[in-house]
């Protein structure tokens, strides 16, 4: 029975991924420049919430604190008319919570893509061969264990995508201190 449930979940996740894949594919038809933001530890200060006890996942995700300067950056992109996509490796059942969080904390005009794991982000980025992409993603994990680790395999593969400008962990730390009252 467990094997059947696991297999069913995997099939459902593949169907959902295909939906987001198609959504992403059609988005590429509209703009030449696309701005993509990860959410956890990029737009939202997520890792401290992982240390809190007695909080269910829905409540935890709903109460994340945004990084104020990154939100200002997003708002500047939005004012400039840029296409903004949020792409996060989160369970698909949190799609509506994630969408509400973005609307309440960042911007109203955006697209949201959820993937079941961080490696699927790379698959989606490869669709946009003829588009200029600015991709904000720390690509890190394990902060809550007092050691920050990185998805080195993805970081290396991103370097091969000439159309993708990756803004990573160190750059995001600098952006947190930058003033975004001026136009980009």
For the regions a protein language model found, what residue spans apply to each?
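Asp-based phosphoryl-transfer active-site loop
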Residues: 32-48
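C-terminal cap/substrate-recognition subdomain and adjoining C-terminal extension
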Residues: 91-184
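Active-site loop signature of alpha/beta-hydrolase-fold enzymes
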Residues: 42-44, 50, 92, 142
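Non-catalytic pre-domain segments flanking phosphatase-related domains
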Residues: 1-37, 183-184
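Short, acidic loop-to-helix structural element flanking the phosphoryl-transfer center
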Residues: 56-85, 95-98, 118-119, 123-124
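Short coil/turn segments at beta-strand junctions that form active-site/ligand-binding loops
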Residues: 31-33, 81-83, 130-133
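Short hydrophobic segments within beta-strands
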Residues: 38, 87, 135-136
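Short, basic/glycine-rich phosphate-binding loops at helix/coil junctions
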Residues: 44-56, 100-106
